[in-house]
């Protein structure tokens, strides 16, 4: 009851609109897709826009903070119930619309997601199904021939990243300390491994899959490219040119090759994975 009253009050607050959460995801979405407002019918935490990249049709998708999100645990850009199902619907819509089209539009996930939404309501209403719905839609689109590109501009954490971005044929990350990829946030990981955050960081320096920084992640071979930028919070003109060029190259690269995720097994830290796969093939 108290929350609905607060919500009503919030909408009357003249400052609430002028002070949104600072969101890299929204800044890059606006710069690349040229649009700002949510589409009618989409949750305010979801941004979807159709545009072009080098003359090829592209649907841009981003999950952004919404301080008025009806689910309090999804107010800071987390992927929750509305966001998971919203992404699934937006991807499915493109899949259906392009079913007969010779050129399937590219899906470009702009990734800045701190985590999935953790809460009792989320658990009760099936957050795992909402996230799985998004993963499934992206995977089906990729297999149907839609080029998928993930652009990491901020955090790419846990189930949120799996639901939005991870299914991409090509992952591109901005080279910046604020761009972090991990299975879970540092504080949670420290709790679960019974270490302090400092101990965890020391350990991560020796074990690349445990690290958070983008260079360690790049060594695992999942990133197609990392890009330096001048002003990561609000992209400069030079940043935009560089990122657009790279996205165009990624698109051309996808359109010219197979649509599976085999490209990830080329990197140094993935040699063991590639060797295991080869040995398995030889033995079977």
Question: Which residues fall in each region the model found?
Answer:
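N-terminal short beta-loop-beta anion/metal-coordinating cradle
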Residues: 39-57
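Well-ordered, non-membrane alpha-helical segments in soluble/globular domains
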Residues: 80-94, 125-135, 240-247
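Structural beta-sheet core signal
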Residues: 60-62, 109, 150
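Amphipathic alpha-helical segments at domain termini/boundaries
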Residues: 2-5, 12-40, 190, 194-284
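Short acidic, glycine/proline-rich loop/turn micro-motifs
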Residues: 70-74, 118-123
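Conserved catalytic cores of soluble enzyme domains
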Residues: 122-239
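A structural preference for short, pocket-lining loop segments at secondary-structure junctions
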Residues: 85-118
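STAS-typified acidic loop motif
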Residues: 54-84
């Amino acid at each position: 009851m108290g929350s609905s009253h607060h919500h009503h009050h919030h909408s009357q607050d003249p400052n609430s609109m002028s002070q949104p959460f600072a969101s890299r995801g929204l800044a890059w979405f606006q710069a690349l897709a040229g649009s700002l407002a949510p589409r009618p019918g989409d949750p305010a935490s979801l941004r979807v826009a159709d545009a072009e990249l080098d003359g090829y049709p592209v649907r841009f998708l981003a999950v952004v903070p919404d301080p008025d999100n009806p689910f309090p645990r999804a107010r800071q850009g987390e992927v929750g119930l509305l966001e998971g199902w919203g992404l699934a619907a937006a991807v499915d819509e493109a899949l259906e619309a392009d079913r007969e089209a010779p050129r399937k539009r590219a899906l470009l996930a702009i990734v800045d997601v701190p985590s999935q939404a953790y809460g009792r309501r989320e658990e009760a209403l099936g957050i795992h199904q909402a996230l799985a719905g998004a993963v499934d839609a992206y995977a089906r689109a990729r297999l149907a021939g839609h080029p998928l590109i993930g652009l990491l501009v901020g955090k790419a954490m846990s189930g949120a990243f799996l639901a939005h971005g991870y299914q991409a044929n090509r992952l591109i990350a901005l080279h910046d300390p604020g761009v972090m990829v991990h299975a879970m946030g540092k504080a949670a990981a420290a709790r679960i491994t019974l270490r302090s955050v400092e101990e965890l960081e020391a350990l991560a320096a020796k074990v690349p899959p445990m690290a958070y920084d983008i260079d360690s992640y790049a060594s695992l071979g999942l990133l197609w490219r990392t890009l330096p930028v001048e002003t990561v919070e609000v992209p400069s003109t030079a940043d935009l040119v560089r990122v657009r060029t790279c996205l165009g190259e990624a698109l051309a690269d996808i359109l010219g090759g197979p649509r599976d995720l085999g490209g990830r097994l080329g990197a140094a830290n993935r040699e063991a994975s590639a060797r295991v796969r080869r040995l398995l093939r030889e033995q079977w």
